[in-house]
């Protein structure tokens, strides 16, 4: 038996297919989902969701949202998502390094709003770079 996974953003459906296993980046840590999982509604952090449609794992960068698990169906509703294979690794690396520098600068200052924004941009850039295979 498999799970039906749908990853939906405000703009499009990023994934709509069967998978064997899912690891979600919830706000309280990673959540593994297999066939027969108990019903669950969880908030998702910006991070990487790993899915196993067959033998190999695939990564999808998620930009925060919610996931609902019920009756072997998993609905992931997020602000943004990109399948790792579609992300250019070198571009993602450059964006990650820039976000890391911006976060370091924001940590030096006393502007709370700037720090919050830099932290969010860092998390997004890290998720994209991880999904592209740039870091584990």
From Swiss-Prot:
GO-annotated molecular function: ATP binding; proton-transporting ATP synthase activity, rotational mechanism
Bilayer topology term: Peripheral membrane protein
Entry's Gene Ontology cellular component terms: plasma membrane-derived thylakoid membrane; proton-transporting ATP synthase complex
Keywords for the protein's UniProt record, in alphabetical order: ATP synthesis, CF(1), Hydrogen ion transport, Ion transport, Membrane, Thylakoid, Transport
Main location: membrane
Family of this protein: Belongs to the ATPase epsilon chain family.
Superkingdom of this protein's organism: Bacteria
Classification via InterPro entries: ATP_synth_F1_dsu/esu (IPR001469), ATP_synth_F1_dsu/esu_N (IPR020546), ATP_synth_F1_esu_C (IPR020547), ATPsynth_dsu/esu_N (IPR036771)
Name of the molecule in the record: ATP synthase epsilon chain
Coiled-coil regions, chain positions: none
Compartment(s): Cellular thylakoid membrane
Gene3D superfamilies in the record: F0F1 ATP synthase delta/epsilon subunit, N-terminal, Helix hairpin bin
Subunit structure: F-type ATPases have 2 components, CF(1) - the catalytic core - and CF(0) - the membrane proton channel. CF(1) has five subunits: alpha(3), beta(3), gamma(1), delta(1), epsilon(1). CF(0) has three main subunits: a, b and c.
Species assigned in the record: Prochloron didemni
Function, as annotated: Produces ATP from ADP in the presence of a proton gradient across the membrane.
Protein encoded by which gene: atpC
Any one Pfam family match given in the protein's UniProt record, by short name: ATP-synt_DE_N
NCBIfam families, A to Z: ATP_synt_epsi
